Structure formats: structure tokens, C-alpha cells
């Protein structure tokens, strides 16, 4: 399950239980809609309640990120698991966004907003 919050200069997505390709497509649609209103997007991905993800999510993420290499300013990854932090770092190969990994939501959101 995914919950997406669209705020002025930040799109926040919280993933609960298993992250499915249906959830990911919902996130893609929200990103594309937000990009119609602004040139670059700040994104906060909260993986703290995510139990795992399906393989098709990983593939969809690679395709989507490669098709939007310059559309993100900052991507904050909120997680308590080191391997999810590494996945965020790996995404830097496909985007020129600044990517930060955080364990605390306050600093994650402040950084994602550019503060």
C-alpha cells in the first residue's frame, strides 16, 4: 500500500507492507502530474513501514528513473535498513538528483525541501 501527499514543493510517499507495481504506478502518476506544475521535483520516500517489494517494482523504477534523469532536485529516502539506503544510492546512476538517506523523518523532510 502507498500513501502519497502532494505538498507545495514536496511529494511525499509512504509505503506500507509490500511495495507492488500497482503502488509504483500510482507514484509514477503522481510524479508526472506534479512535474506538469513545476520543472524539478523534491521527493520524500518513506520506506520505514515497507516489508519488501516485488521484482517488477525494481524494474519499473529503473525504467521510470532513466526516463526522468533531470526531473528531480532532491530525493530523500527515509529508512532504518542499510540495504534500502544502498538502493537509494544506486539510483544516482540514473538521475542527477541529490539523494539523501535518513532514519529520522524531521531532517529527511527538511533536507528534501531544500532547507
What are these regions (language model features)?
Residues 1-115:
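Amphipathic, Lys/Arg-enriched alpha-helical "gate/interface" segment within cytosolic domains
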Amino acid at each position: 500500500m502507498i500513501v502519497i501527499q502532494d505538498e507545495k514543493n514536496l511529494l511525499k510517499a509512504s509505503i506500507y507492507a509490500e511495495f507492488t507495481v500497482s503502488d509504483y504506478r500510482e507514484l509514477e502518476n503522481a510524479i508526472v502530474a506534479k512535474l506538469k506544475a513545476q520543472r524539478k521535483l523534491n521527493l520524500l520516500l518513506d520506506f520505514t513501514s515497507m516489508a519488501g517489494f516485488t521484482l517488477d517494482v525494481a524494474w519499473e523504477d529503473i525504467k521510470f528513473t532513466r526516463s526522468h534523469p533531470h526531473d528531480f532536485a532532491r530525493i530523500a529516502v527515509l529508512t532504518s535498513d542499510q540495504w534500502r539506503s544502498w538502493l537509494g544510492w544506486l539510483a544516482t546512476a540514473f538521475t542527477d538528483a541529490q539523494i539523501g538517506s535518513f532514519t529520522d523523518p524531521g531532517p529527511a523532510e527538511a533536507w528534501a525541501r531544500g532547507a
